[in-house]
């Protein structure tokens, strides 16, 4: 098989003064540039919602940030960072004030961003241009191209990179031991050898559509998500073909194909204790348990169905210990469950977005939610209560993917009470933005809190999420 490879970053960037909008994306006349160096900070939550009314109590979290103003994210180069900007952000945080700020913006005139993966100093981005680009310190470090179409998912395991594509293929790439900026294609999942061996036996074919059969080890539709098991030995792939497939990375074998849902599987998350969570366009969130934990084989059984609703489940996230699970839906709501022993109990609903939740990322006590309304909400969990710390604004299109890493500067200093995270957000506006986010809550005085606006609870869904206003109706395609 011929190797596809990429070298160092090229210099064919297009100098631009505006970020192109995604197709059919209306212009937002409320975006206003008012800051020097085209940099901007997160919108203060105090300006958006009543901080005293918490989502855990079933009250509206905040007014939609749809009409909030923010400085334009327009850049004058393909890779931008503001000199001195980072030092100012550090100083603000060191002074004890919560300041979630934009560090930089990565823009390339080639495609909408559908997938992200952060690994140490490197950031991998996938788009509908078929390119996978690698960034280091806000600069393009490498690039490689696949012939498999839109890159819907990326995950990194040691020196291997796995990419899931719209055409149902999973590509495997290796980093060259001699040159870290060179990536070579190492194969596909399933391997050609396994495809040939399986095709001989008629019992290996299953019906995927009316009058259409395919090998059970192959996905018959787009690969929507990839996730690694806790021990790194298994790879889970979710697909629009309604299945989840389980791969053993040591020999690239497909161990199991789970008929998981009645519609497209949009997300899969592997967590601790052999638990696997899946969310689907059929409106359900399911918990699967790996029966043969610690063995070379893998069999999974359905342990629990957490949610069943009319709206599509469009995103999932869980902490490493699987103690809390988050689910985002096409109605703009985020449900969450807490684990007690072997059972999950519904913890509440987070209401911070006007349109569909397209991505979620959990980091420590924080949850980041990205939406089709172009914003990212930063939530902090304290016990059963979630508070919105800030709303990150600046994208000019739906926020499609998120990735989070510990801020290196925060890690060196030991973190302390002000642990900070680097958040990457990819959008259909063809840009990736890099944010510094603090775990510290905003310091809102009593006088400021008294002046915060109040909202009519009847205009938003009930605490059980059963009634939706026109602003929160199903706002996105069920498949993501």
Where are these regions (language model features)?
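Terminal intrinsically disordered, low-complexity extensions flanking WD-repeat/beta-propeller proteins
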Residues: 1-58, 62-63, 68, 183-211, ...
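Short C-terminal beta-strands that terminate individual repeats in beta-propeller domains
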Residues: 103-108, 141-146, 185-191, 214-218, ...
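Canonical WD40 repeat/beta-propeller blade segments in eukaryotic WD-repeat proteins
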Residues: 110-116, 149-155, 196-199, 212-228, ...
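Conserved strand-to-loop turn within each blade of WD40 beta-propeller repeats
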Residues: 126-129, 164-167, 222, 231, ...
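WD40-repeat beta-propellers
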Residues: 132-136, 170-174, 238, 244-248, ...
């Amino acid at each position: 098989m011929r190797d596809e490879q990429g070298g160092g970053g090229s210099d064919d960037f297009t100098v631009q003064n505006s970020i192109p909008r995604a197709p059919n994306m209306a212009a937002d006349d409320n975006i206003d540039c008012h800051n020097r160096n085209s940099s901007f900070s997160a919108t203060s939550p105090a300006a958006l919602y009543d901080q005293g009314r918490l989502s855990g109590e079933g009250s509206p979290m905040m007014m939609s940030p749809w009409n909030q103003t923010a400085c334009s994210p327009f850049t004058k180069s393909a890779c931008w960072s503001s000199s001195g900007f980072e030092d100012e952000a550090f100083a603000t945080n060191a002074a004890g004030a919560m300041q979630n700020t934009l560090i930089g913006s990565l823009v390339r005139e080639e495609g909408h961003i559908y997938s992200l993966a952060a690994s140490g100093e490197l950031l991998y981005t996938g788009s509908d241009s078929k390119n996978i680009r690698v960034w280091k310190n806000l600069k393009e470090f490498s690039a490689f191209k696949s012939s498999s179409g839109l890159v819907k998912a990326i995950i990194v395991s040691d020196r291997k990179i796995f990419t899931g594509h719209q055409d149902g293929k999973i590509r495997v790439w290796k980093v060259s031991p001699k040159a870290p900026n060179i990536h070579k294609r190492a194969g596909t999942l399933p391997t050609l050898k396994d495809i040939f061996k399986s095709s001989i036996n008629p019992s290996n074919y299953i019906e995927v559509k009316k009058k259409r059969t395919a090998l059970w080890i192959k996905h018959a539709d787009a690969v929507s998500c990839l996730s690694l098991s806790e021990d790194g030995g298994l790879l889970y792939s979710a697909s629009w073909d309604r299945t989840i497939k389980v791969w053993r990375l040591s020999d690239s074998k497909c161990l199991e194909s789970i008929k998981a849902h009645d519609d497209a599987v949009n997300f899969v998350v592997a967590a601790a204790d052999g638990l696997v969570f899946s969310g689907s366009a059929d409106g359900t969130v399911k918990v699967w348990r790996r029966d043969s934990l610690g063995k070379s084989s893998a069999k999974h059984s359905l342990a629990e169905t957490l949610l069943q609703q009319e709206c599509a489940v469009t995103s999932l996230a869980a902490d490493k210990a699987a103690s809390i699970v988050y689910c985002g839906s096409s109605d703009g709501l985020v449900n969450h469950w807490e684990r007690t022993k072997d059972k999950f109990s519904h913890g509440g609903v987070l209401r911070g977005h006007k349109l569909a939740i397209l991505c979620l990322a959990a980091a420590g006590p924080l949850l980041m939610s990205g939406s089709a309304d172009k914003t990212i909400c930063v939530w902090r969990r304290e016990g059963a209560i979630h508070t919105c710390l800030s709303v990150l604004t600046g994208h000019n299109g739906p926020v499609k993917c998120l990735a989070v890493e510990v801020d290196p500067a925060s890690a060196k200093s030991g973190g302390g009470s002000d642990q900070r995270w680097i958040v990457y957000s990819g959008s259909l506006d063809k840009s990736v933005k890099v944010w510094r986010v603090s775990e510290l809550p905003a310091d809102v005085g009593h006088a400021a809190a008294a002046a915060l606006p109040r909202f009519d609870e009847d205009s938003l869904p009930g605490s059980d999420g059963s009634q939706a206003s026109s602003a929160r109706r199903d706002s996105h395609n069920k498949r993501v």
